[in-house]
């Protein structure tokens, strides 16, 4: 029996920040139904694919009814009758239908939701876990990064660096590493309370104490790691996402950072001091504005041999921009966000390109999340190696980690079979 896409239907739902987003249901001819929910970001790169919003007064202009209409109308009409097992054909059909360079006509939220829903339906139709359907064999669990102190656009406090993350370095399994993170997270709460600060949470489940500096946040992290019974860097390491575009002033070309107004060279000197003071930092993301490639390149030239330097806002999971980053030696790692580019196929192209050029990759959630666990399966399927999905708190974050625990258990039980399992999905 030939299985084909019977229809796709969308509706407007809400994400973890109370903003509207798109949910898509895919219906196959064999009776299979699957859904996907699309996340959205607070700190977004200018080169990201367009997230179609309605504008106007309703829901602060953030409604997505036009994106929903696009799924239910032209996207549905274009995909009816296609094989759900040929992901590349599904995605390229939508890209061609949209006809713009940034998916501005149909909306990346409409296109991605459909891309994900059909992939999940195809896996379900074959009675396979999504990670196995997408990845086939030789699957590995990822290193996870957890945003436990939120600043920047993710919190209302005095810290300009957006994310302070911890990652388990010494671990016997994903579960073992995650338990270390949970222990450190609870120790951090105690450290913050002992210092007299509130322990309210930011968008990504991390604490958002009203600290005065990034150094203060890093000292708290170090103290929490030790309090939890671990050794900084040896057991638990630290990473940060500066999201520097959020504190870069385009009018004067300076970085307005925690009471200072610095040029690129002064910002570089600050990072140099910070990394020397905190050797437990192993990964740095977006240390400069997305258009400040010159200083980004200088940062990588200076620290790239000892630290992971992750590019996000300046490449936006876009293969064309990643090629330029490779040529210019901008970074040594690429952040992967499916909704920045808008289809599974293009995201896979970016991962392959980075890996071919000896770059690491890190799959990422967004600050406006849903309970959808697609990225957990996707990270394992692609052997991306790294995932960041927020703190071990707030259900929309923890759902991803719980899914990884399930996957680890399944891989452990079925490892011998998985090593010989064919890849059933066509991405070419």
Swiss-Prot record:
Residue positions binding Mg(2+): 241, 285, 312
Cofactor binding comment, as recorded: Binds a second Mg(2+) ion via substrate during catalysis.
Reactions mediated catalytically: (2R)-2-phosphoglycerate = phosphoenolpyruvate + H2O
Entry annotation: catalytic residues: 204, 337
UniProt pathway annotation: Carbohydrate degradation; glycolysis; pyruvate from D-glyceraldehyde 3-phosphate: step 4/5
Origin superkingdom: Bacteria
Positions of disulphide bridges: none
Protein residues bound to (2R)-2-phosphoglycerate: 162, 337, 366-367, 388
One Pfam family hit: Enolase_C
Subcellular location: Cytoplasm; Secreted; Cell surface
Enzyme class: lyase
GO biological process, one term: glycolytic process
GO MF terms, alphabetically ordered: laminin binding; magnesium ion binding; phosphopyruvate hydratase activity
Cofactor(s) listed in the protein's UniProt record: Mg(2+)
PROSITE patterns (UniProt xref): ENOLASE (PS00164)
InterPro entries documented for this protein: Enolase, Enolase-like_C_sf, Enolase-like_N, Enolase_C, Enolase_CS, Enolase_N
HAMAP family, per database record: Enolase (MF_00318)
Function: Catalyzes the reversible conversion of 2-phosphoglycerate (2-PG) into phosphoenolpyruvate (PEP). It is essential for the degradation of carbohydrates via glycolysis.
Matching NCBIfam families: eno (TIGR01060)
Family to which the UniProt record says this protein belongs: Belongs to the enolase family.
Name of the protein this chain belongs to: Enolase 2
The organism of origin for this protein: Lactobacillus johnsonii (strain CNCM I-12250 / La1 / NCC 533)
